[in-house]
UniProtKB/Swiss-Prot annotation:
Gene for this chain: Angpt4
Sections of the chain in a coiled coil: 181-269
Subunit structure: Homodimer; disulfide-linked. Interacts with TEK/TIE2.
Predominant localisation class: secreted
Keyword Membrane: no
Region described as Disordered: spans on this chain: 416-436
NCBIfam families cross-referenced by the UniProt entry: GGGWT_bact
Annotated signal sequence range: 1-21
Function: Binds to TEK/TIE2, modulating ANGPT1 signaling. Can induce tyrosine phosphorylation of TEK/TIE2. Promotes endothelial cell survival, migration and angiogenesis.
Cellular compartments per GO CC: extracellular space
Segments crossing the lipid bilayer: none
Keyword set, alphabetical order: Angiogenesis, Coiled coil, Disulfide bond, Glycoprotein, Secreted, Signal
Protein name: Angiopoietin-4
InterPro entries in alphabetical order: FIB_ANG-like (IPR037579), Fibrinogen-like_C (IPR036056), Fibrinogen_a/b/g_C_1 (IPR014716), Fibrinogen_a/b/g_C_dom (IPR002181), Fibrinogen_CS (IPR020837)
Amino acid sequence: MLCQPAMLLDGLLLLATMAAAQHRGPEAGGHRQIHQVRRGQCSYTFVVPEPDICQLAPTAAPEALGGSNSLQRDLPASRLHLTDWRAQRAQRAQRVSQLEKILENNTQWLLKLEQSIKVNLRSHLVQAQQDTIQNQTTTMLALGANLMNQTKAQTHKLTAVEAQVLNQTLHMKTQMLENSLSTNKLERQMLMQSRELQRLQGRNRALETRLQALEAQHQAQLNSLQEKREQLHSLLGHQTGTLANLKHNLHALSSNSSSLQQQQQQLTEFVQRLVRIVAQDQHPVSLKTPKPVFQDCAEIKRSGVNTSGVYTIYETNMTKPLKVFCDMETDGGGWTLIQHREDGSVNFQRTWEEYKEGFGNVAREHWLGNEAVHRLTSRTAYLLRVELHDWEGRQTSIQYENFQLGSERQRYSLSVNDSSSSAGRKNSLAPQGTKFSTKDMDNDNCMCKCAQMLSGGWWFDACGLSNLNGIYYSVHQHLHKINGIRWHYFRGPSYSLHGTRMMLRPMGA
């Protein structure tokens, strides 16, 4: 930038020098002068022509000029030429002097111009520096503002990232706290389960000890039964001899039966004669009307009785009458009750013989007896009705067609057809052909002896889905009892019921 004024000054000097050279150009000869000008880092070279000095032409030799006469003729002409040359030379010297003055004036003017340019150049340089500083300041301010904006943006981003990291940290702390609480809860549960396991282990050890004691007791009972068996065997031998004696006496009695028949014949004839005598008498003889005989409650219902209560029936091939409770109101009446549970007043943990003959009060809790039910169901097809009541007031009933009970030799096996009920479609009663079991007669098709484990006598098929003769549990104690009064598809396998009834009626009655 500092070289531009110098270049301008040197250009002006060049123009002046070229103008002077042009003024002297026509007179210039073959010689030239070289002038070099340097201004700062720039240099300039000027080539100026130098005028030649004109020399007189050499005088020819006299021989060439044709003798002395020709020289004498040409001498005035040479002098004339020299005079012109001197006049031209003086004129040229004057012009050179003028050009030098012009050059000196131009040089002074150029020096003044240089000084003016330097002064102006300083002001321009100061202004240029100020403009440059202002531009740089503006640029730096713009850069600073841009940097500030970028810094603010980065600060906002960092603040957002910091907030996000803080939120994630709080979330992780919350999750760790929840995990810690969950871990503490699991530890407490594991501790409680460990304590419960220890308690169960202690109870299991107690049960094992009790089981060992029971096994020892059962072994002692088996030994006692073995001794009793041997005693019975010896007694059986004694009874065999006694039976032989009785047989001999029976033959003797049969021989005497003929005489008894004769006496009976005579007695019959005497009675007939007595009847004829009484018939011939004038006084009338009142005869009692024979009392009607019923084989079940349905026949009593057909006779016109409509009140539920205890009645007497006479079953086939039975020598003594049987008292039964007749329900004359439920579903048309005529039902003969064979089982009733309502308050736990009767213990149903009985032997085979007791279940065979029956026990309890027929007006309340009782079991009619397997033998009576067998004789009752052997003469015709019967309908079995089972009624169930729970502790919440709900009740249901199930009916089975073609119910029949086998003989004692058949272990009072169960025979029923399909059921219809409000307790679900599935059947909780034992399947066809299941035998009756008690605590002293195991017919349950299981090594576990269900009658002893679940209590009572019932048709157990590998312990099965029902037992209406189990232990009677009162309210608030009836839950989680597998040895209670249960019917699986009514209230589940461990709910002990409030009351039950089982009753029979001939089909079609």
